[in-house]
Amino acid sequence: MTKKLTIKRKVKEPEPQNEAPDSHESSDNEEEEEDLLQAVKDPGEDSTDDEGIDQEYQTDSSEDLEFESDEEGNYLGRKGAEGSSGDDDEESAEDEEEEDDADAKKSSKNNDEEAATTSKSIKKSQEKPTSSNKVVPVVPARDPSKVEYADSDTSDEEDIRNTVGNIPMHWYDEYKHIGYDWDAKKIVKPPKGDQIDDFLRKIEDPNFWRTVKDPLTGQEVLLTDADIALIKRINSGRIPNEEHDEYAPWIEWFTSEVEKMPIKNVPDHKRSFLPSGSEKKTVSRMVHALKMGWMKTTEEVQREKQEKRGPKFYMLWETDTSREQMRRIHDPVSAPKRDLPGHAESYNPPPEYLFDEKEAKEWHKLKDEPHRRKLHFMPQKFKSLREVPAYSRYLRERFLRCLDLYLCPRAKRVKLNIDAEYLIPKLPSPRDLQPFPTVESLVYRGHTDLVRSVSVEPKGEYLVSGSDDKTVKIWEIATGRCIRTIETEDVVRCVAWCPNAKLSIIAVATGSRLLLVNPKVGDKLLVKKTDDLLAEAPVLDVIENERIKTAVQWANAEPADQEKGVRVIITHFKPIRQVTWHGRGDYLATVMPEGANRSALIHQLSKRRSQIPFSKSKGLIQCVLFHPVKPCFFVATQHNIRIYDLVKQELIKKLLTNSKWISGMSIHPKGDNLLVSTYDKKMLWFDLDLSTKPYQTMRLHRNAVRSVAFHLRYPLFASGSDDQAVIVSHGMVYNDLLQNPLIVPLKKLQTHEKREEFGVLDVNWHPVQPWVFSTGADCTIRLFT
């Protein structure tokens, strides 16, 4: 078992010559001390590259050896006997240390120039017990009170052990070494301790506060007292050099008094004391000019200037017009020149510049909006210049040109050179946003007139459509087969399948009647349950209002209609344009644009009663919509959209569309975003939590947009227009309210045919799959997958 022994070395100051040497340094112990120090190197020699780092001595002795040496490391004497016991050795060592300390203090008082004594304890570890007493020394830590190179002539450049130069040292973070020494050998990084080691060093090491890390070698350097004093002086804002005297007496190396001395000391000439002849001639000329009246005095010149100038009048309140006049004088802006005539204005233009019938018809159609025309005139062709008549709009164009020159303000604008690609928002690729419909898969044919509306069963197996041929057809989606056809007495404007999967009901708006139809498809138990629900009318204790009785009447279907599947008929006093269901399937709303203040009605299926939510009409109602989550009701007029709270019966918000005519709207399944279609070729995306104005206006179609629809599961929405196109777009709504919705147009599906200026009339999504259905004026229903 190894034992760590400690060798203590004390630096003892030289004693005065008149004092005798210590009594305990006898000649008997000199031989033993010399044998002990045979393997010990001179402490003045630097055996390692690390300054100030304590190292251990390996010895096989079982004793603590203590000896004394001078500043240069010469051996002076040994303290204590080798054969004494551990306790006696410790006591004798302590007594000798006290005596040495007293001697050191005494000598420091007598001689201030001598170095102070310091004691260092160096621990030694023994790995295996051996018979030899060989001791390997390590250079002790440097005394902080002394300058590092006070006793040597070593320069700073020679002390630089790391030769990598002035580079960032973090380049060596991934390597085990930190650079190269003068012999081109790697300098290995010192071992790094953890936080516990740092904490123990902070407690045990008294010099921890003055220890810094050298970034070049990674070693820890102990700051001297001079270094600390220098740092303190710099922090306190004083001059770093203590020997510099700030208030030394001023030495005038050069005098501050100006001494004037002549360049040449030549005596004045004799003619310098006589009057100048040239000045005499000049004065005589001026006198002659005054006598002849050619020359005037200063007073006469000032008087003539005052008479010419006349009286001055100043404006008390200066206006902006005067400043503008001065600006026009000093910085005029020339009038813009008219554009040179092009090929279209020629009397014999090329054929491609002449209008065809379609372009001429469109040009005449924009008579009320001439600013939207491509050209302000219609190009004409003549055989010769003699046949060209007088230009009928010449005087008007000259008059408008004069108005532009006279009334239009002129200003210089700095043209910004902005790259067009910088203005285009960066959108993800459509390939990354799949799935979405890309091709036409099925065409459902069977109607003989316009197909106005389409709706899908909640489970996604069947499809219902309504047409102007006064029929309602139920289709099987997978095969395209028409299962049932229900004939009505009037044009079918709208159909809507009940969103509640526990009921099998279709609401059909035909003329002024609302038919509740059981399609008799799907689960037989579900069909029977629906018939039982609609068979008997519930008994109502509440007396209905006269306004409601005159507006709507509930009745069971006749036997002939019962065979077709019609169960309940709700008769309105005006033609119905739209019908929509609440998410739970118990309420449905109808819109009658000609109904004035009774245009919108809400019907409750379970109690067979109706309500008129509004007492006053604030516009021509186009369509209505239920909120999917909250008890809110959306009412769209021609120009605006109002949101009402059905519980509090008050207006919540009014959305400003800035459009001429609203055609339809659809709400996002989460209920925070609304999509509106208009007849003026626009789609408006409203963020209900953000503002009452559109978050984004999309102009994707060339003609009126008839219908829009959100998908219930996927971040998709579609729009149908009279340009026979169905445009599918990606509309991602994030849960983070601080992140705006992502809108990306994906695919344009254009397979419908145009009939009498009509194209796609309605679009609807499959409830489960990313499929979209569209109805058109070509009497077909098309499925895109």
UniProtKB/Swiss-Prot annotation:
Main location: nucleus
PROSITE patterns noted in UniProt: WD_REPEATS_1, WD_REPEATS_2, WD_REPEATS_REGION
Keyword Membrane: no
Region span, Disordered: 1-160
Record has rRNA processing as a keyword: yes
Biased composition (Basic and acidic residues): 103-112
Example GO BP: regulation of hemocyte proliferation
Sequence ranges of Acidic residues compositional bias: 45-54, 61-73, 85-102, 150-159
InterPro entries tied to this protein: BOP1/Erb1, BOP1_N_dom, WD40/YVTN_repeat-like_dom_sf, WD40_repeat_CS, WD40_repeat_dom_sf, WD40_rpt
Keyword vocabulary terms for this entry: Nucleus, Repeat, Ribosome biogenesis, rRNA processing, WD repeat
GO terms under cellular component: nucleoplasm; PeBoW complex; preribosome, large subunit precursor
SUPFAM superfamilies: WD40 repeat-like
Gene Ontology MF, one: ribonucleoprotein complex binding
Subcellular location: Nucleus, Nucleolus; Nucleus, Nucleoplasm
Role this protein plays: Required for maturation of ribosomal RNAs and formation of the large ribosomal subunit.
Family: Belongs to the WD repeat BOP1/ERB1 family.
Name of protein: Ribosome biogenesis protein BOP1 homolog
